[in-house]
């Protein structure tokens, strides 16, 4: 597997993406959409929304959450098999000064939340956060961890573009086969464009964790925010064109790209 991944990195990445697309249908078979007949025959309890822990468990029992949980398991299993833990970014950020590069995505998060939060209580917030966390961990481990490590030997800019493209294609394929095309295109665009910023952070901080932090914070903010018309348009602009531009800015020339890498270089041992 490692020989194939290193010898044919692009085909390896396409194969993993296609495998995940197939897993989508397995997850939908596990949690099928139940057809609704005569609602008058349903018990009253059916119409009572769950509360507390019941709400959290109910929201987590979904095809999407199962899909990303399986993606996490697949990514970790392949990283263990290939031994790519350090190269995939499972290390401490060695470029601590570059943590300031999180400022722009976190500023977008703050803008997203500027109109307030729409929630029915702490349980709903916890449920949304856990669902978002599983999804962002799955996407980052696969695309900015495993696939990034396979592609980055050809340069960080190429790795950013290809991993973002594959992530966007996976999202549009999964969403378009189960929902309306406009929503699929919107989510795919956010995924593709966000990948530029998360991938650039991955390179500049030498770790996967800052990207996970930024991705989770933004996805959670979008999930709970109350967006007005103007704020919505501004957030969409910043999280698409803005994230692409920011990611390319962080990797704009060889001297800037040199301030980053896969992992922290090990100091030589003097004997």
PLM segments and residue spans:
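Juxtamembrane helix-loop-helix connectors linking adjacent transmembrane helices
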Residues: 36-42, 46-60, 64-66, 76-141, ...
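Transmembrane helix-loop-helix hairpins at the membrane interface
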Residues: 122-265
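Alpha-helical transmembrane segments
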Residues: 8-24, 98-110, 162-166
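N-terminal, membrane-interfacial amphipathic/helix-forming hydrophobic leader that caps
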Residues: 1-86, 196, 202-203, 221-271
